UniProtKB/Swiss-Prot annotation:
PANTHER family: MITOCHONDRIAL RIBOSOMAL PROTEIN L24. The gene is rplX. Part of the 50S ribosomal subunit. One of its GO terms (cellular component) is ribosome. One of two assembly initiator proteins, it binds directly to the 5'-end of the 23S rRNA, where it nucleates assembly of the 50S subunit. One of the proteins that surrounds the polypeptide exit tunnel on the outside of the subunit. This is Large ribosomal subunit protein uL24. Belongs to the universal ribosomal protein uL24 family. The keyword rRNA-binding applies. NCBIfam families: rplX_bact. CDD domains: KOW_RPL26 (cd06089). It comes from Thermoanaerobacter pseudethanolicus (strain ATCC 33223 / 39E) (Clostridium thermohydrosulfuricum). SUPFAM superfamilies: Translation proteins SH3-like domain. SMART domains: KOW.
Length: 107
């Protein structure tokens, strides 16, 4: 049975490493661990044609972010200026922190 765990969390800054949006940076808006997908701000924009459901909700063409596989993104390190691998350190008080493997800064 596969483990439902992602290497990125909501609010993380990530960079896309493959696909049509390769190289784009953005914040993770939503994570779906069971599907292994994330929604990244400004990445994988799709066009939806919505029908008006009521006078308060008009229809029209809407542009919104669609989920992408989490394997297509890497955590972004501000210090290195690129996508990086990360490690996990356990502090004396038991708190876990993620750190950049290139520059050893906390992410």
């Amino acid at each position: 049975m596969a483990q439902n765990k992602l290497h990125v969390k909501k609010g993380d800054m990530v960079v896309v490493i493959s696909g049509k949006d390769k190289g784009k940076k953005g914040k993770v808006l939503q994570a779906f661990p069971k599907e292994g997908k994330v929604i990244v701000e400004g990445v994988n924009i799709v066009t939806k044609h919505r029908k008006a459901t009521s006078p308060q909700k008009p229809g029209g063409i809407i542009h919104q972010e669609a989920p992408i596989y989490s394997s297509k993104v890497m955590l972004y390190c501000e210090n290195c200026g690129r996508g990086v691998r990360y490690g996990v350190k356990v502090l004396e008080n038991g708190e876990k922190i993620r750190y950049c493997k290139r520059c050893n800064e906390t992410l």
